[in-house]
C-alpha cells in the first residue's frame, strides 16, 4: 500500500476526481511537453458532471485560458469512467500527448502508469494482514504507521491543521454557494440552532453535524480541504476529529494518531476496491469516509484491533449500495447533508462496536470486497453521472 501522503491530499474542492486529479494531469502535461495550445477531451463521468465540478476551470487555469474543452458524454467502453485525453497543437495538428484516468481521491493514472509512480510503503495488502502484523508485534494501528512511515506524522500535522481550518472557516461563513442551485450555507445556523427540549444527545449530534457541514460547504465553495478519502466526503473525518478535539479536549497527539489509524483503513479500501464515486457510487466515498472516521474514533478510545475493525466494518457495511447522484452535477445535494449524517453514523458505529466486537461474523475485508462488487454492478446512472436518482428528479413537481 502507498504512503498516507497519497491518501490525504491538501487541495481545493469541489471534487478530488474532477478537479484535483485533472489538475495533476494538466501539470504533468505542462512539465513534460511545455506550454502551448492544448485541447482536453473528457469522457464518462468527467464529461457528464465535469462542468458542475469545475473540471474545465482547473484545466484552463493550468493549461491556459484558450484551452479547448470537449465534453464527450457518449456511452463507450472506458478503462475508468473518469477518463481524459490531452492534445497539444504542433505544426497545426492536434497531437495526443496523454491519456489519463482520475481514479479517485485525486490520484491519477497517466499513459497506463500511476502518477507519480511511488513505491509501496506498507507491504500488507489487506486488513487481515495488517491485523496479523500488529497483533504479532503488539502494536496499535498508529504504531503500525510509525513502524513503516515514521516521517509521515509531520505531514499529518499539516493535514490536521488544514482540516481544522476548514471547519473553522466554514462555521464563520454565511451566504450562497456557487452554482445554479443557489444553496445557502447552513453550518453556522446549525451550530447555533438550539431547539426547545433539545436533549444532550441531540445537541452533540447537531454540533458534530455542523462541523461536517462546515467542511463540505467549504469544499463546494472551491475552498482548501483534505481528501479523506475524497473531496466529496471531506467533511466526515474532520468533523469527528474536531468534535473530539474541541468539545472533548482530546490532545493533538491523539488526533494525529487517529488520522494515522483512519489512513490505514482508507488505504486498505483504495488498495482492494475503489474510492471513486464514478466507479462505485457514493458508498466508495461517503461510505469509506464514514469507515475511516469510525476507525479514528476507535483509536482515540484505545480500542483493540478487533474493536477498530468492527467499527470500520459496521460503518462501511451500512453504506453499501449508496448511490452517487449529485443534483446539477454539483457537490452540494445530497453531498453536504450526507457528510453530516455519515459523521453521526461513524460515532454510532463505534458505540455499537464497543459491545458487539466479540460477536461479529463479517470481516472488514469482506465488506470492502462486497462494496467493490456492488459498485461494479451499479447502473451508471447512479455513479456520478447526474443522470439518475435525485439528479434526474430534481425540479419535478414534488420538489416545488
What do these predicted regions represent?
Residues 19-31, 238-249, 294-302:
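Alpha-helical support elements that line or immediately flank enzyme active sites
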Residues 8-28, 221-240, 282-290:
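Conserved phosphate/anionic-ligand binding catalytic regions in large, soluble enzymes, centered on
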Residues 9-11, 276-281, 326-335:
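Short beta-alpha connecting loops at secondary-structure transitions
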Residues 164-249, 253-267, 274-277, 281, ...:
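Accessory "access/gating" subregions that flank catalytic or transport cores
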Residues 65-197, 207:
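C-terminal regulatory domains involved in ligand/effector binding and gene-expression control
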Residues 210, 214, 235-245, 260-268, ...:
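Contiguous, well-ordered alpha-helical segments that form the cores/surfaces of helical PPI scaffolds
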Residues 297-400:
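Functionally critical mobile loop/hinge segments
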Residues 1-9, 23-46, 52-53, 63, ...:
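Non-transmembrane, aqueous-exposed alpha-helical and coiled segments at domain scale
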